[in-house]
Regions:
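Membrane-interface transmembrane helices that cradle and orient dolichyl/undecaprenyl
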Residues: 3-9, 44-62, 70, 173-174
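Alpha-helical membrane-protein architecture signal
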Residues: 17, 24, 58-65, 144-149
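Transmembrane-lumen/periplasm boundary regions of multi-pass, lipid-linked membrane glycan transferases
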Residues: 51, 69, 73, 78-200
C-alpha cells in the first residue's frame, strides 16, 4: 500500500513503523481470529487500491473473495470495514458491475456455505438464525463500558509517537483532491467512528 500511494523507495518504512507499535507487538504472536481477519481486510483494501480499470480482473476477483472469507471469520463484523470503504468503493463503483467481482464473492462464501450445510443437521434451526440472534443479543445487552469516544483517544495513544504524524497526514490528505484521501483519511476515520458507535 505504501508503494501504491507514495513510492517504492521508502516502502520499507511502513512495516518498520508497524512493528514498533504496541498493538502489533502484542497481537502478532497470537494465532487468533483477529489476526486472520485483519489480514483479510488488508488484502481487501490492497486489492481495491490495485483496481485501476475493468481489466484488473484478478484484483476485482480478490476483492470479492476476501468479503466471504472475512464473513466466515467474524460474521457481521465484516460490514465495519466495508462501510468504511464506501467512499472509495463509490469512487471506483464500475467494478461492482463486473462478473469477476460477483464470482469472487461466491468463491469467498463457499467455505462458509460448506460449514453451514455441514452443521445445520445437528441444530434445531438454521445457523443463520443463531448468528442473527447473537448479533441482536450483543446489540441489546451491551456490556461495553467504555464511552463512545474511547477509540478516538485510545488508538492515538496506543500508536504513539507515530500517531502525531498520522493525525497531521490525515488532515493534509483530507484537504487534497487526490483519490488517496479515501483510504488514507476517510477509511480510518469512518472505521474508528463505526467502532465507536457499535460495541465489538
Amino acid at each position: 500500500l505504501h508503494e501504491e500511494f507514495f513510492n517504492k523507495k521508502y516502502a520499507i518504512i511502513s512495516p518498520l513503523i508497524l512493528s514498533t507499535t504496541y498493538l502489533w507487538f502484542d497481537y502478532s504472536h497470537l494465532a487468533t481470529q483477529d489476526i486472520i481477519y485483519s489480514c483479510l481486510v488488508s488484502i481487501g483494501v490492497f486489492s481495491l487500491v490495485k483496481i485501476k480499470s475493468k481489466d484488473n480482473k484478478f484484483y476485482i476477483l480478490l476483492f470479492g473473495i476476501w468479503i466471504g472469507l472475512a464473513f466466515m471469520m467474524k460474521t457481521f463484523l465484516v460490514f465495519v470495514p466495508l462501510l468504511s470503504l464506501i467512499p472509495y468503493i463509490f469512487f471506483k463503483k464500475n467494478f461492482l458491475f463486473i462478473k469477476f467481482f460477483w464470482l469472487g464473492l461466491l468463491i469467498g462464501f463457499i467455505p462458509f456455505l460448506f460449514w453451514t450445510f455441514s452443521i445445520n443437521p445437528y441444530l434445531d434451526k438454521n445457523i443463520i438464525f443463531y448468528l442473527v440472534e447473537k448479533f441482536n443479543f450483543l446489540s441489546s445487552k451491551n456490556t461495553f463500558t467504555n464511552p463512545f469516544y474511547y477509540y478516538f483517544w485510545n488508538v492515538p495513544v496506543t500508536f504513539l509517537p507515530w500517531s502525531f504524524f498520522a493525525i497531521i497526514g490525515t488532515i493534509y490528505n483530507i484537504s487534497q483532491s487526490k483519490e488517496n484521501k479515501y483510504i488514507l483519511a476517510f477509511f480510518p476515520l469512518i472505521l474508528v467512528g463505526t467502532l465507536s458507535i457499535f460495541s465489538t
